[in-house]
């Protein structure tokens, strides 16, 4: 693998949009230090309108500058973790962020202590219109903020909140060793690769060896996740929420019906998913599918070759349906302004991401390979995130630009759908068509159905804890096994180790997070349907949604596009698309 200094400059992202040189960066660091010290002087002063305005402006100035230097440091480090200078810069930023947090921490509680009618009157002043929504969101939290002493007690316990997840990570990623299969290491990250092996014996060996280690540690792992669930319930009750579910949906003002509608509608339509596994069983020519058979590819030996530039052209051509404004900006970013850090080098972070900050550009990290069509889809996916960030930044003040995780996957999934449609229209090779269509189906299973199953599991266990019902290891595994059988259907035979999968899902340590993947694809496919069918204002309203950023709550933003996630029809649309794609691929395999 080549070193960072061997990568062509044109293949690296251009961070000069953040800082032209190191001198400018150091100057901003010093300015933040000075502003942070000055901010301390406001702590003891009683708020009036002028002081409130001044303090608010200073606070967001500091936060904007801090975001800028932090992104610069993070982006430098992600391209080469072995670089001493990058590590030093990152360390400086971490320390600075801690200092800023400690010094400014008094400010939001101070706002909440001030008479709410006063604050409401102040934020209605035209001079504060660019901060109004952010403050209204803070005021909404007021009834869940405790006394100063109680808040201090909870704050002191904050490091312990993540301790269960930290122990889980250390145990599963460091202490648990899975050995080798055919001289290749079996790890948490390579496990899925083994399940994609054509040889069922290798898949079975990987499955049994992997989950036997989880079996050996099942009591510890079960206690960790149960304790984490109970910790979240304690925090929720302490903050005057009914339960963890209510607390987690509160900050984004998500209607509980969004969650329950997702699970109920998917459950009503599970025969469609069961049908897919029956189809997979027939293609693999097996009497039964086993848990280790669900990831093996149904096509093989298919080679796509696209240079980065070729991939960009295909993506841009496909996205012309979103209008000239969208493609012109994206073309400039991908091919001229160097938003993308393209290729792998020693010390570079694996995978891909989009990182948009209010200043600079919405950068994209890739490890692009010409022979991987997956990498072309990854580029389209991350470009969706970056364009969402671009439009959000250009159309909102700093306090309102950050959109929620709930909305984040919509733009990226829409890009993938549009690209796939374009490739299928222009492809004549049956095997390549098979591959693209199967990839679409696999992605829908992993993003929509699987995440809904996880969401249902979480909901059941958290509800039991909320009702103070006993939850033990067997509660987890029995609940999960029932869900596996329900979602996968009669075509699959499960091993007694299968339900231990519930003990290895890191996202369960972030309560009620995974459902957002499923609602994200449901919203995206609903918007995509309107665009594909040339519905009036579909594209215009979608771009309006992207430009909304964090200026509205997620469901209100989505309302611009006509998407309502509380309605069965929105979820059924996703299931119907899955059903159509399954019928299409069945015909190709006949």
UniProtKB/Swiss-Prot annotation:
E.C. no: 3.4.24.-
Cofactor binding annotation: Binds 1 zinc ion.
Binding, Zn(2+): 381, 385, 388
InterPro entries linked: OligopepF_N_dom, OligoPept_F_C, Pept_M3A_M3B, Pept_M3A_M3B_dom, Peptidase_M3B
GO biological process: peptide metabolic process; proteolysis
UniProt similarity note: Belongs to the peptidase M3B family.
GN (gene name): pepF
GO function term, MF aspect, one: metal ion binding
NCBIfam families: pepF
SUPFAM superfamilies: Metalloproteases ('zincins'), catalytic domain (SSF55486)
Keyword tags: Hydrolase, Metal-binding, Metalloprotease, Protease, Zinc
Active-site positions on this chain: 382
Xref: Gene3D superfamilies: Oligoendopeptidase f, C-terminal domain, Oligopeptidase f, N-terminal domain, putative peptidase helix hairpin domain like
Name of the protein this chain belongs to: Oligoendopeptidase F homolog
Enzyme class: hydrolase
Cellular-component GO terms for this entry: cytosol
Cofactor: Zn(2+)
């Amino acid at each position: 693998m080549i070193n960072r200094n061997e990568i062509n400059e044109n293949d690296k992202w251009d961070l000069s949009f953040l800082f032209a040189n190191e001198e400018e960066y150091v100057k901003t660091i010093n300015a933040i230090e000075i502003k942070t010290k000055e901010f301390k002087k406001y702590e003891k002063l009683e708020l009036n309108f002028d002081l409130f305005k001044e303090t608010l402006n200073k606070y967001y100035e500091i936060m904007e500058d801090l975001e800028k230097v932090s992104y610069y440091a993070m982006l430098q480090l992600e391209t080469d973790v072995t670089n001493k200078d990058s590590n030093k810069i990152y360390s400086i930023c971490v320390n600075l962020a801690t200092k800023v947090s400690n010094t400014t921490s008094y400010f939001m509680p101070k706002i909440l202590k001030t008479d709410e009618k006063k604050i409401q009157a102040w934020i209605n002043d035209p001079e504060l219109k660019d901060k109004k929504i952010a403050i209204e969101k803070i005021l909404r939290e007021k009834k869940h903020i405790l006394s100063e002493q109680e808040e201090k007690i909870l704050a002191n316990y904050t490091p312990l909140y993540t301790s269960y997840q930290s122990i889980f990570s250390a145990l599963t990623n460091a202490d648990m060793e899975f050995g080798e299969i055919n001289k290749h290491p079996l790890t948490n990250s390579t496990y899925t690769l083994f399940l994609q092996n054509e040889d069922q014996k290798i898949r079975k060996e990987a499955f049994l060896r992997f989950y036997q280690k989880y079996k050996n540690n099942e009591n510890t792992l079960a206690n960790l996740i149960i304790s984490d669930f109970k910790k979240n319930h304690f925090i929720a009750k302490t903050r005057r929420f009914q339960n963890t579910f209510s607390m987690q949906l509160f900050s984004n003002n998500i209607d509980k019906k969004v969650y329950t509608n997702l699970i109920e509608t998917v459950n009503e339509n599970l025969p469609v998913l069961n049908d897919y596994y029956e189809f997979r069983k027939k293609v693999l020519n097996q009497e039964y599918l086993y848990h280790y058979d669900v990831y093996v590819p149904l096509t093989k030996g298919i080679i796509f070759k696209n240079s980065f530039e070729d991939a960009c052209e295909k993506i841009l051509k496909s996205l012309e349906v979103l209008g000239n404004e969208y493609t012109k900006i994206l073309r400039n970013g991908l091919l001229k302004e160097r938003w993308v850090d393209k290729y792998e080098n020693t010390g570079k972070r694996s995978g891909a991401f989009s990182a948009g900050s209010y200043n600079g550009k919405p950068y994209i990290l890739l490890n692009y390979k010409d022979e991987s069509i997956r990498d072309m889809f990854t580029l389209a996916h991350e470009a969706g995130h970056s364009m969402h960030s671009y439009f959000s930044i250009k159309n909102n003040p700093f306090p309102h630009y950050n959109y929620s995780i709930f909305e984040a996957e919509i733009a990226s999934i829409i890009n993938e759908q549009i690209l796939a449609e374009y490739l299928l229209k222009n492809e004549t090779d049956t095997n390549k068509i098979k591959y693209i269509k199967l990839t679409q189906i696999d992605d829908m299973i992993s993003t929509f159905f699987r995440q809904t199953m996880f969401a249902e599991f979480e909901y059941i266990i958290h509800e039991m804890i909320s009702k103070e019902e006993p939850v033990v290891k067997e509660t987890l595994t029995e609940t999960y096994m029932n869900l596996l059988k329900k979602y996968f259907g009669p075509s699959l035979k499960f091993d007694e180790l299968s339900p231990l999968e519930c003990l290895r899902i890191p996202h369960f340590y972030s309560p009620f997070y995974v459902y957002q993947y499923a609602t994200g694809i449901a919203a995206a496919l609903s918007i995509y349907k309107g665009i594909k069918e040339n519905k009036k204002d579909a594209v215009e309203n979608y771009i309006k949604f992207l430009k909304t950023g964090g200026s509205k709550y997620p469901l209100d933003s989505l309302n611009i596009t006509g998407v309502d996630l509380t309605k069965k029809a929105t979820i059924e649309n996703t299931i119907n698309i899955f059903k159509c794609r399954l019928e299409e691929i069945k015909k190709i395999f006949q």
